[in-house]
């Protein structure tokens, strides 16, 4: 499943360009929604998008090229989502909010992947 690993100048450039776009988008979200809620929003949205992208990548007749998957998945969405910020922000919360933030982040992350897959499946006309 997924895209085969390619380490060459082209795929490295695609990851760099996608990463730059994802980082700017992540920064924009952080400016619009400060603190743990902004991180939660970025991670949930990124999970949804990556769920759709991964579903599409797994299709034998994917409409996106391997380059597009590298640019969007490994580049853009990897830079957009952030586990390290989530961990640091969670550690700074009061204990009861720590548990709530962890539970909410994982619940929305998994739900986002499932919803993203469902959206991609519907767009493809799949019934799996």
From Swiss-Prot:
Domain of life: Archaea
One cellular-component annotation, GO: plasma membrane
GO BP annotations listed: cellular detoxification of fluoride; fluoride transmembrane transport
Reactions the enzyme catalyzes: fluoride(in) = fluoride(out)
Transmembrane segment boundaries: 13-35, 40-59, 71-93, 97-119
Record GO terms (molecular function): fluoride channel activity; fluoride transmembrane transporter activity
Key words of the record: Cell membrane, Ion channel, Ion transport, Membrane, Transmembrane, Transmembrane helix, Transport
Family recorded in the similarity comment: Belongs to the fluoride channel Fluc/FEX (TC 1.A.43) family.
Membrane topology annotation: Multi-pass membrane protein
Coarse class of the protein's main subcellular location: membrane
Organism in which the protein naturally occurs: Halobacterium salinarum (strain ATCC 700922 / JCM 11081 / NRC-1)
Entry keyword Disulfide bond: no
Protein function: Fluoride-specific ion channel. Important for reducing fluoride concentration in the cell, thus reducing its toxicity.
Subcellular location: Cell membrane
Classification via HAMAP family: FluC
InterPro entries reported for this sequence: FluC (IPR003691)
Protein's recorded name: Fluoride-specific ion channel FluC 2
């Amino acid at each position: 499943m997924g895209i085969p690993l390619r380490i060459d100048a082209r795929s490295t450039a695609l990851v760099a360009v996608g990463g730059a776009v994802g980082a700017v988008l992540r920064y924009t979200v952080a400016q619009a929604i400060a603190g743990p809620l902004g991180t939660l929003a970025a991670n949930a949205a990124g999970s949804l998008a990556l769920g759709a992208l991964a579903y599409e990548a797994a299709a034998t007749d994917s409409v996106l090229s391997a380059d597009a998957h590298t640019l969007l998945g490994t580049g853009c969405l990897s830079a957009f989502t952030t586990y390290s910020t989530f961990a640091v922000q969670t550690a700074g919360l009061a204990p009861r909010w720590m548990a709530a933030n962890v539970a909410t982040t994982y619940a929305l992350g998994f739900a986002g992947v499932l919803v993203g897959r469902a959206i991609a499946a519907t767009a493809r006309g799949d019934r799996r």
